[in-house]
Amino acid sequence: MFTINVEVRKDQGKGASRRLRIANKFPAIVYGGEEAPVSIELDHDSVKNMESKPEFYSEAVTLVIDGKETKVKVQAVQRHPFKPKLAHIDFRRV
Protein backbone atom coordinates (compact mmCIF):
# COMPACT_ATOMS: atom_id res chain seq x y z
CA MET A 1 0.00 0.00 0.00
CA PHE A 2 1.15 3.53 -0.77
CA THR A 3 1.04 6.46 1.68
CA ILE A 4 1.56 10.03 0.47
CA ASN A 5 1.88 13.14 2.65
CA VAL A 6 0.14 16.03 0.91
CA GLU A 7 -0.60 19.69 1.58
CA VAL A 8 -3.84 21.55 0.93
CA ARG A 9 -3.41 24.11 -1.85
CA LYS A 10 -3.79 27.71 -0.78
CA ASP A 11 -3.70 29.29 -4.25
CA GLN A 12 -5.74 28.26 -7.29
CA GLY A 13 -5.35 28.97 -10.98
CA LYS A 14 -2.86 28.66 -13.80
CA GLY A 15 -0.16 30.86 -12.25
CA ALA A 16 -0.28 29.01 -8.94
CA SER A 17 -0.06 25.65 -10.74
CA ARG A 18 2.95 26.84 -12.72
CA ARG A 19 4.70 27.97 -9.54
CA LEU A 20 4.06 24.53 -8.03
CA ARG A 21 5.56 22.77 -11.05
CA ILE A 22 8.64 25.02 -10.94
CA ALA A 23 9.04 24.00 -7.26
CA ASN A 24 8.98 20.30 -8.32
CA LYS A 25 5.42 19.81 -7.07
CA PHE A 26 2.14 19.43 -8.94
CA PRO A 27 -1.57 19.97 -8.23
CA ALA A 28 -4.16 17.27 -7.61
CA ILE A 29 -7.75 16.99 -6.39
CA VAL A 30 -9.55 14.59 -4.06
CA TYR A 31 -13.29 14.19 -4.61
CA GLY A 32 -16.17 11.80 -4.01
CA GLY A 33 -18.00 10.54 -0.96
CA GLU A 34 -19.82 12.83 1.44
CA GLU A 35 -17.01 15.37 1.86
CA ALA A 36 -16.33 18.40 -0.32
CA PRO A 37 -13.59 18.25 -2.97
CA VAL A 38 -10.12 19.23 -1.73
CA SER A 39 -7.34 20.72 -3.88
CA ILE A 40 -3.94 19.39 -2.84
CA GLU A 41 -0.30 19.60 -3.89
CA LEU A 42 2.10 16.66 -4.11
CA ASP A 43 5.87 16.25 -4.37
CA HIS A 44 6.63 15.19 -7.94
CA ASP A 45 9.61 12.89 -7.38
CA SER A 46 8.05 10.79 -4.61
CA VAL A 47 4.80 10.30 -6.54
CA LYS A 48 6.67 9.58 -9.80
CA ASN A 49 8.51 6.69 -8.09
CA MET A 50 5.21 5.24 -6.80
CA GLU A 51 3.44 5.86 -10.10
CA SER A 52 5.88 3.62 -11.97
CA LYS A 53 4.46 0.58 -10.14
CA PRO A 54 1.20 -0.96 -11.50
CA GLU A 55 -0.22 -1.34 -7.97
CA PHE A 56 -0.45 2.46 -7.71
CA TYR A 57 -3.42 2.34 -10.11
CA SER A 58 -5.14 -0.82 -8.87
CA GLU A 59 -4.89 -0.56 -5.07
CA ALA A 60 -6.11 2.06 -2.61
CA VAL A 61 -3.65 4.86 -1.83
CA THR A 62 -3.59 6.57 1.58
CA LEU A 63 -3.30 10.36 1.51
CA VAL A 64 -2.36 12.15 4.73
CA ILE A 65 -4.11 15.53 4.51
CA ASP A 66 -3.47 17.78 7.53
CA GLY A 67 -2.81 14.71 9.72
CA LYS A 68 -6.00 12.93 8.63
CA GLU A 69 -5.72 9.74 6.56
CA THR A 70 -7.98 9.39 3.52
CA LYS A 71 -8.20 6.26 1.34
CA VAL A 72 -8.41 7.06 -2.36
CA LYS A 73 -7.98 5.46 -5.78
CA VAL A 74 -6.37 7.10 -8.79
CA GLN A 75 -9.13 8.23 -11.16
CA ALA A 76 -7.17 10.13 -13.83
CA VAL A 77 -3.58 11.16 -14.52
CA GLN A 78 -2.47 14.01 -16.78
CA ARG A 79 1.10 13.99 -18.05
CA HIS A 80 3.32 16.52 -19.77
CA PRO A 81 3.20 15.96 -23.56
CA PHE A 82 6.90 15.17 -24.02
CA LYS A 83 8.70 15.47 -20.66
CA PRO A 84 8.55 12.58 -18.17
CA LYS A 85 6.51 14.73 -15.75
CA LEU A 86 3.11 14.41 -14.09
CA ALA A 87 0.87 17.44 -14.57
CA HIS A 88 -2.20 16.58 -12.45
CA ILE A 89 -3.88 13.62 -10.70
CA ASP A 90 -7.54 13.11 -9.80
CA PHE A 91 -8.11 10.95 -6.71
CA ARG A 92 -11.53 9.45 -5.88
CA ARG A 93 -12.35 8.67 -2.25
CA VAL A 94 -13.02 5.00 -1.50
From Swiss-Prot:
The keyword Ribonucleoprotein applies. Pfam families: Ribosomal_L25p. GO terms for cellular component: cytosolic large ribosomal subunit. It comes from the Bacteria. GO terms for biological process: translation. Gene3D superfamilies: Ribosomal Protein L25, Chain P. Keywords: Ribonucleoprotein, Ribosomal protein, RNA-binding, rRNA-binding. The keyword Ribosomal protein applies. GO terms for molecular function: 5S rRNA binding; structural constituent of ribosome. Belongs to the bacterial ribosomal protein bL25 family. Part of the 50S ribosomal subunit; part of the 5S rRNA/L5/L18/L25 subcomplex. Contacts the 5S rRNA. Binds to the 5S rRNA independently of L5 and L18. This is one of the proteins that binds to the 5S RNA in the ribosome where it forms part of the central protuberance. NCBIfam families: PRK05943.1. This is Large ribosomal subunit protein bL25. It comes from Serratia proteamaculans (strain 568).
